[in-house]
Swiss-Prot record:
It catalyses: a 1,2-diacyl-sn-glycero-3-phosphocholine(in) = a 1,2-diacyl-sn-glycero-3-phosphocholine(out); a 1,2-diacyl-sn-glycero-3-phospho-L-serine(in) = a 1,2-diacyl-sn-glycero-3-phospho-L-serine(out); a 1,2-diacyl-sn-glycero-3-phosphoethanolamine(in) = a 1,2-diacyl-sn-glycero-3-phosphoethanolamine(out). This is Autophagy-related protein 2. Lipid transfer protein required for autophagosome completion and peroxisome degradation. Tethers the edge of the isolation membrane (IM) to the endoplasmic reticulum (ER) and mediates direct lipid transfer from ER to IM for IM expansion. ATG2 binds to the ER exit site (ERES), which is the membrane source for autophagosome formation, using basic residues in its N-terminal region (NR) and to the expanding edge of the IM through its C-terminal region. The latter binding is assisted by an ATG18-PtdIns3P interaction. The gene is ATG2. Residues 216-247, 712-738 are annotated as: Disordered. It comes from Yarrowia lipolytica (strain CLIB 122 / E 150) (Yeast).
Amino acid sequence: MNWIPNVQKRAFHYVLNRLALFSDLELDNMDISLGTAQKAALTNVKLDPDRVSLPAGMYMRSGKIDEVSVEMRLLGGAGIAVKIDGVHITASMKQMDVETATEHVEEFLERTTADLAASILSEDLSASLQIDPAEEPPLLGMGGSGISEALVKKVTQTVLSQLTVDVTNVHVTLFVAADDKMDLVVDEVRLRPQGGQEMALEVRGVKMKVMDKKARGTSAPVTAGSTAHATTGFTSESDSDSDTDPFSNAKKSLLQSTIFSHEEASSIYMSAIAESANLGFESDPLFGVFYVDTIDVLVFLGEEMRVSCEVGIVRASLDLLPTVILSLVKVGNGGSGGKKSRDSETKEGTAMDLNMSIKSISASICQLGDDWEFKNIDTNLLFSLSDISGSSGAFHKLQIGVCEVKRGSTRVFGFESDEKNTDDEEPTPRDSDILLKASSASFTLVLPKKAVGVFTIPDLIDVVSLITYLLSLIESKQQKAATMTERSERAGASKTTVQTNTFDFDVAGHKLYILPIRLSNGQMSLSRVSFGDVHVKGISFENSIVSVDKVDFDIGLPIVEELHQLLLPIIDAMNSAKNRPVPASVQTAPPKLLRIVEEPVNASSLVINVARVKGKVDLGGKVGVIEVVLGGISVTGPTDRIEISTVEIGRDLSDLGLSKKWLLHPLKRESNVVVELSSGQIQLITVKNCALEFYTELLELFGGKGDDTKAAELQESSSPDSSSRESSSGSESPPKRIPLQIHNCAVGLNPTNSSSSAQFIVKHVTCEIKPSPTFSMTSFIGSASLLLIDDASLVTPNPTDLMSSYLEQYTSVASLTATSISISTSPGNPTCININGDTVTLSTCADSTQTLIHLINSLKPAVELSGAKFQLETLDPFLNTFQDVDDCFFKAKNKDACESSCSSDNDDIDMVSDDVPNNMSFVESYYGGDKPSQSRKSGRQKMAESYTHADFLLDSDLDSLVKRERVRFEEICFEEDYFDKEEEDMPVMSRPRASSHDLASSNELLTPPTVVINIDLIHNIVCNFHDGYDWQYTRNEINGAVDGLKKRMKERPVVEEPPVMTTDLLFNSIYIQAKDEDDLDDVVGEQTEPAKPKEANKSRRGLLSRSSNPLVQVWLQGIACLLTVYAGLEDPDLPPGQVLNSLDVKIKDVEIIDHVPTSTWNKFLTYMRSRGEREAGAVMAHITMQNVKPVSTLSSQEVICHVTILPLRLHVDQDTLDFLTRFFNFKDVRTTAPPDETFIQKFDIRDVPVKLDYKPKKVDYSGLKSGKSTELMNFFILDESDMVLRRIKLRGITGFANLGQKLNDIWMPDVRRTQLPGVLAGVAPVRPLVNLGGGIRNLIVVPVREYKKDGRVVRSLNQGAYAFAKTTTNELVRFGAKLAVGTQNLLEGVVSTERAGESRDLDDSDLESTTKYYTYMGYSDSNNKLISLYANQPLGVYAGLQDAYSSFGKHMNVAKTAIHNLSEDISEADTAGAAAYAVVKAAPVALIRPIIGTTEAVSKTLFGVANEMDPSGRELARDKYKEAN
């Protein structure tokens, strides 16, 4: 029995090593005495970190026990009793995969017996026991061979079966990361054997506290000594390089200590532990997050482990618990994903049998107090689970008796038993709220009871905040682990089954009702979900695809606003939860754990399909009920992509006099709206094939003061919150941008009380919308077009492709390209709209132009004025009408009176040089003697003075002007210090104040603008005016009128002599007049398309259609426009003369191109180049308009307009003029005139110098007989006729049509009375003589003018002679060229048969004109235009000689060919008559063609000489004449 003490010592040594692992505890130094009871006590014992075995994922940094006592009693059955008090352990986390952690737990529970057996059966057992086997007698019949293994195990089990352990006051400090610290306190742990292989573990008072970062900031304070530890990475067996451990220096120091001696290593080791423990967390605040009162575990340690666990009350704080969970389960990629250890392979198929029961689990967002009860539980949600029982083995089962959520004493969520209200049965509630069963092949979740809940806004905020924070933790780790290896595929597939009862919730006063959910084999079905008046039907789920059959809703604007107010705090809570700092432990958490948490919530592969959504939205007010229909909705992600196939929005417009209209509808059966998302943020919205219908009546829905007041109140109530919210978030994140792309969409324009309609088609539009903090939108329109139709009822729509119906049945009248539009608005600032464009093109006929104008006018809303527009005032009966009449008005011949009056006011007599352009001497003397006005005169007196000055200037004699004393420079006094004066000392030059009607000129009447529309620049606006008619109605009316005239002509008596003219006027522009029935078609052709050749095989219907090419083009270049809106007509408290809006239009260049084929001229209107180059930045036309409210008590507005136009050059062909007259005089009888025409308070147009070329083609003798004196102009060709359309100020004009008539009535008499010499000087035969006379005049005027400047006689005579020679020579050369061209035209008229042989399609009547300065070149069906011989002039003498040589050679070749053909014709002639006919036919060509070539060569040469002398003549000819290429 000598071995018994050694066994006792070894058992005692084993217990101490297993339970305490004391440092430097040697077996030989232990004195154990034999007896009935042995007891040892140790105090302040330090633990060896290298020998302590902790659960998986942790290693100990330091440890200490206050008191340890071990008592061994081998007799009496007391066994071994271990009591430990005051355990203090500091540990850190390390990485380990989930499989290894699970195996480690099972191994930790089972290895006690095996370790003890290994200790007893060691190789040096005999030596350590000091027993001689030969001397030891047999024990219990085992012989002398030694101690058997079975005996050792039996003894070991006997010892362990009587081992009791009591541990009190356990305090574990766990460091998860550099800034995460946890404290775990256990009041008492008791381990008791229960007989056999059963052991009971009792745990009392488990408490956990963590550090609250909100109390100390985002990072923990680190001392100087621990700085290195916080930045050093932790090296593990895992392949993850991203995870770090701040406590790796402890292990590193430990490894380095092995090369020293025992004493040195111990010293270095303890210093390393002290260094790594100095992290400065002692002062950090700790808060309770987890508490368990009792845990009772019964373990059967057999071959199959059985565990029975009973847990009492569990409390957990959800405020910091997510950080704790993610930190504690810090598992990485240590496992290589598929590799298993040999031990784990041997343990496959064995499962631990676990039975567990929990009395209650309570969780809340609030923290636990010092008494481990929840703080402020009455104001926070409490999640409660009770009566929890479960079992685990081959089949897992979990049963939750009661599941509910409370806030204080109010129940928020829970389950209720279904009650069968019958007479025979009693209500039978079911036992459990939640049943869960799981195995390796199946998972079943059953909710047998009906879920009920009443959620308020605070409840939703708390729940959403918690969920959002959890998701943000997962998302932050997903971003960090993006470069990790892909997720391994799950082995096998499990069968999941979910069965629920109904859900009946009250969400902020709105009912949410969900019918039972069924999920089986990956297929989920749900018949209906209702939320208020929103009903979702036919929900199914299969293979990550959610399908919804139909969604119906009927909601009103108050509900929408209520839901909006409901969502605002929830969204704020989500944002605040997302912005909470993510713990470093979560940032460094291993990916595998997050994969486990991620898998249930990952929705990247989820697809939601909704077949149809239909419902009504009551927006309230005048807008009323809007019907919305969405079809084919597909949501991917669901935060990646939303696709809607069809979008329809409609409204019943019966209250507006219309039927039900779809305001938004698809054009094609394709995808209409696609929303691309990223992390819940909109990345791109694409809209395709949608049509938006605009009805003028819809504007009435948004009018009214009540709606404005309501909108203002709503904006006022929501703006502060939103602005503050945006301002707070704007500092943290950049402003949100919503990109939008629109492809192949249409905007329908449907005017009021009109049958016409238009479609604005956009091909491609890109937009970017910034909703906050200030709304702004920038868009770019690649290309768009405007389609028009006169009668929308004639359209036959194609339901499957409306776009093709529009393109086929509508007429394109306008298009635009490369246009950018930006809109910005902010509180307190006006709404600004900036527009830039490349080219805008209008292509219309006469009827479509009127339809377009009428449609634009009809799109304006009908304004209901609250006040009267006019009022009647009674004037004083004794009004003196001659009070403001100047007496000198009737004394125009008195020059002294005129001179005295001309110095009084020069406001209306500006641009004197334009009035008398050649009287330069008078201009100098006039401005030299001018004096500022000292008095204010009336408008009538100014007009009288202007006419007086005109008479005076016309009556002035050149000699009297020359005799005037010239101005000497020494008489001008310069004041050197003028600009050094103070501002108040400088004289102020101001214009005389305008009349009382010019109320808008005062800056006091300009309120801050509300809307500013700025067209920065549109490069080109092209207006194409086509001949013919676009509408079938117009063509039918013309054909009907012609057929009626034919019928009338057939019915008239034949005996009438002479035949009576039959006439008719159609559309106020087509005048039909014919004597014979056969001439009617020709008359119609000439009226509609006079420029086209007459073809016998061309029908009247073809002549009435739109021409392929425009006859007139209007080019506007460099258009800039500024529209400023200051106030509305109905705005209250407007002073008299308040400017409502102003329009400023500037046009850099204006040109009208003549494409009429019978016209040889190019530009109908252009800038007068003879005036020289324009100033930099000068515009050709400048128009300013202001709408003012003259009387504050009347609902009326008046227009004040100012127009400035640069000098104009006109080349007017009578055919072109007739076309334009007919084009703009067209009146459609179906369109009504606007009910109220604009009243023009004041119209001011400044002097417009004009130089006119006019080519008449025919004379209307009937009009001449009726007294139209303007027909006399058709007898003369005008060439460079000069006139000035003088400045006119008109007041009180109704309508712009009357304005044009008034201007004509004033300008024409003025031109005839005062400017007739300049007009007559432009008569074609007289113009060369006038130009020669101008040269002679320069021989006198130029020397006199130069002499007056510097007094040098010889230089003045030289300049006069040079001007005379240059002018005279140039005019003589050009006059010779004109004679040569005229001769050529006469000779070509003789060779008329040649023209017919060259397939000339024009009749001789087309050549019968007063002028014949044109020939036929380049004529074809595609380009029907005549080219004048004045066109294509050579640039100089050398070019003129080259053109002369080629022209002469061309005509000589024609003559040569004619002579060669003549010889062949004579040889082929059978008779002398035929030969003579051939000679007569070829003689004109053979004889006259060389002469024509000679005249053309002479004209080309002379034109070259003239352009060499005056290079500007080439540009003038290019503006006037069409060119061949």
